[in-house]
UniProtKB/Swiss-Prot annotation:
Name under which the protein is recorded: Trichothecene C-4 hydroxylase
Primary localisation category: membrane
UniProt gene name: TRI11
Localization annotation: Membrane
Membrane topology, as annotated: Single-pass membrane protein
Pfam families: p450 (PF00067)
Length: 499
């Protein structure tokens, strides 16, 4: 009996301590925490579960934009997370520095790819990949890319002939995934051929939506176990099928000697295979899969975004269309080189599109060292704090850009940068870094930029576009690390149809 009473008293004592610790923790986080001097939403700081709920609902990034407009350059949005929107923060968080801030990894088991790798392996993977994105590599890959863009234009011409509206998001995705699939695996996903998504691509879209749940699970392990218990078996099977497809396709590419020397990604990655600094077969599979995700969905996203904003800004659309059609004698003249050197206004349009609709709208967290204070954009940040530059908030903040809600490519032209009388002179253009900065910046930036420029230039060369009424508010989207894009319905008028 005495033992039973003792157990009961012990349980009550434990429960009392636990219940008492909640308000104490809230008070500590709000008023005594080393980061308490940085403003932010008190509800999220006191009860960080609400920050996770916002992510799961797909409204986190929109709310972060509001919080930065309310609180300023630095926002503390959970007990140990701080977001910034300044140029200096890009340098302090992501750039080369003596004590490099580590990338925050959701998974406890790192995949052997360039995203999840530690600093040593990341440098090794990057060294193996860089030649593929060099001028020589791009020159070898351009014929492959051009072939898919040719097919892309043919498909749009077929759709145009029907007189019906079409979803440009799908066509951009079909094309970019086919291109990157061929460059990484030696074969396309058949999107342009079959006019539908390959199962691995459909899984990729769904998988990004799960990142918010994984992030919540990292903060609340019990919640993760509950969520995993309710994960649909079909999703798990799709993941396994995707990984099996990647391994099988890479194996087939390795065995196909006819493709050796074609200058694609795998060709370059294989050059040091078996050597100490080279990639083993497991790393080849993981990095090929990563390149496909990173080099396709984001590329299609910016193409979709610039298409929408051009159609919403008729004077800009007219100006860039005239530039494209007057710069070349024929469509064949639109190449990687010419689309970059002869279309300055189109390049400015892309810069403005990246500002309005960055493919990765959120922040990419880094973790401050476990000892000492880290200075970020003038703020003293305590150890083990997750810090980031929130891209959408930074790019849309009035402190960084004059009339930020307007689509104005002129802010990126030389006159705006050098003429003090320009209304855009004081815009903080270095704040816009969609490809990141520092040692983990986008390794495929050169290819992505060339690809999107040629694709858009050829669309504008061939077609007059019209936004369908149902897509008028297309940018009203949720975000789950990437944008949850709906259909971008457009009507295409083939300017050569009657010729």
């Amino acid at each position: 009996m005495a033992n039973a009473i003792s157990v009961g008293v012990a349980v009550q004592l434990v429960l009392t301590v636990l219940l008492a610790s909640i308000p104490l923790r809230v008070i500590w986080n709000l008023f005594f925490h080393p980061l308490s001097y940085i403003p932010g939403p008190r509800l999220w700081i006191a009860f960080p579960i609400f920050r996770q709920i916002a992510s799961i609902r797909g409204v986190f990034d929109a709310q972060m934009c509001e919080y930065h407009r309310k609180y300023g350059n630095a926002v503390r949005f959970s007990p140990n997370e701080v977001s910034f929107i300044t140029e200096q923060a890009w340098r302090d968080i992501y750039d080369h520095r003596p004590n490099q801030l580590e990338r925050f990894i959701l998974s406890t088991t790192r995949r052997p790819d360039i995203f999840d790798a530690n600093e040593i392996d990341h440098a090794r993977y990057r060294k193996a990949m860089l030649p593929a994105f060099s001028p020589k590599g791009l020159q070898e890959q351009e014929p492959i890319v051009r072939g898919y863009i040719d097919t892309f234009i043919e498909r749009l011409r077929e759709v145009s002939a029907t007189g019906e509206s079409t979803d440009m998001v799908k066509w951009y995705n079909f094309t970019t995934f086919d291109i990157i699939g061929d460059l990484a695996f030696g074969e396309s996903f058949g999107g342009l051929r079959n006019r539908e998504y390959h199962f691995t691509i459909s899984f990729t879209f769904e998988a990004f939506k799960l990142l918010s749940y994984l992030e919540a699970g990292a903060a609340y392990p019990l919640l993760l176990k509950i969520l995993m218990a309710f994960t649909p078996q079909s999703l798990i099977e799709a993941r396994d099928k995707k990984e099996e497809h990647a391994e099988t396709t890479v194996r087939k590419r390795l065995d196909n000697r006819a493709l050796h020397g074609r200058g694609d990604f795998m060709d370059y990655l294989l050059r040091n295979r078996g050597e100490k600094q080279g990639l083993n077969d497991k790393e080849l599979v993981a990095n090929a899969s990563t390149l496909i995700t990173a080099g396709s969905e984001t590329t299609a996203t910016i193409l979709s975004g610039i298409t929408y904003w051009l159609l919403q800004t008729p004077n800009v659309l007219q100006k860039v269309t005239e530039e494209v059609r007057s710069a070349f004698q024929s469509e064949a003249d639109i190449t990687f080189t010419s689309a970059t050197s002869q279309l300055p206004y189109m390049l400015a349009c892309f810069q403005e599109a990246f500002r309005h609709y960055p493919p990765v709208p959120t922040g990419m967290p880094r973790v401050t060292p476990s000892h000492g204070i880290t200075k970020i954009s003038g703020y003293d940040i305590s150890p083990n704090t997750k810090v980031s530059v929130h891209q959408l908030a930074a790019y849309s903040h009035p402190d960084n850009f004059h009339r930020p809600r307007e689509f104005v490519p002129e802010r990126w032209l030389p006159d705006a940068k050098t003429n003090p009388s320009s209304p855009w002179y004081n815009d903080r253009r270095e704040t816009v870094q969609p490809f990141n900065v520092g040692p983990r910046n986008c390794v495929g930036r050169n290819l992505a930029e060339q690809e999107i420029r040629v694709m858009l230039a050829r669309v504008l060369w061939n077609f007059d576009l019209e936004l369908a009424p149902e897509s008028k508010n297309w940018t009203d989207q949720k975000t789950h690390f990437l944008w949850e894009k709906g259909a971008l319905m457009c009507k295409l008028h083939d300017r050569f149809a009657s010729k």
